[in-house]
Regions:
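N-terminal catalytic cores of peptidoglycan-degrading enzymes
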Residues: 2-150
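Basic/polar, cationic surfaces and motifs that engage anionic cell-wall
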Residues: 17, 24-26, 32, 39-72, ...
Length: 235
């Protein structure tokens, strides 16, 4: 009877030892798991912090910064006006969201006439480019600076004034072709597309460029031609 009792006591002790070992292993497993989780969390936290500190080095270059390095094509006559009044303040664009088309509103005046007008001290208006009656193109303001042509949108747009032979505001063939070429080139350099080409009218409601306001179909044709030219540039 005594031996039987001892047997049960020993078996009970063995069970306790087994349970104790299992509990010990479980505690160790939980401890190791928690420790690993803490290490992983610390690693990613420090990695995120390091990335945050280095982020400026990977910041994408803005369209404005890119334009500072753009070389203007040889078919553009660069005649920058001097800094004065509001015509050219030297203020940089905040962004480039649109290319804005205007018409000069003075029939038969040339690109040179309009550029020289912008350059006068008393003049408070200007545009980045003027497209002339013979298809000539004059640049008046650097691409990355504000011009004074599109009201509140001067801060984030590039403006093009276009000459016309008569009061209808319709551009002749040479002028039109140069306008398409210039607009497509600007879109290609800024990463925009034909849908980003707008009229002065679309900003303020002013009838400018007159012919494209009065003939919506011709405006759409123009954007279509720009799209085709842009596609050719990308080939």
């Amino acid at each position: 009877m005594s031996s039987k009792k001892e047997f049960y006591i020993k078996r009970k002790r063995r069970r306790r030892k087994i349970v104790f070992r299992r509990i010990t292993k479980l505690v160790l497993f939980i401890g190791i798991t928690v420790g690993l989780m803490f290490l992983i969390k610390s690693f990613f936290k420090s990695g995120a912090s390091e990335y945050k500190e280095r982020k400026p080095f990977f910041k994408s270059v803005s369209r404005v910064e890119k334009l500072k390095k753009v070389s203007v094509p040889e078919w553009v006559d660069v005649q920058l006006i001097h800094r004065h009044s509001t015509a050219r303040t030297g203020t940089e664009l905040s962004d480039i969201k649109n290319i804005v088309i205007h018409y000069v509103g003075n029939p038969k005046t040339t690109a040179q006439n309009n550029r020289d007008f912008f350059d006068k001290d008393a003049t408070k208006v200007s545009s980045h480019f003027v497209v002339g009656l013979n298809g000539e193109i004059i640049q008046c303001v650097p691409l990355y600076e504000k011009s004074a042509a599109s009201n509140e949108r001067n801060k984030d747009s590039i403006s093009i004034e276009v000459c016309h032979p008569d009061a209808s505001g319709k551009f002749n063939t040479e002028t039109y072709n140069s306008l398409v070429k210039l607009t497509a080139w600007l879109l290609n350099e800024t990463g925009l597309n034909e849908e980003n080409v707008i009229r002065h009218y679309d900003i303020t409601g002013k009838l400018c460029p007159l012919y494209f306001v009065e003939h919506e179909d011709k405006w759409n044709d123009f954007k279509s031609d720009v799209k085709t030219e842009l596609s050719n540039l990308k080939k």
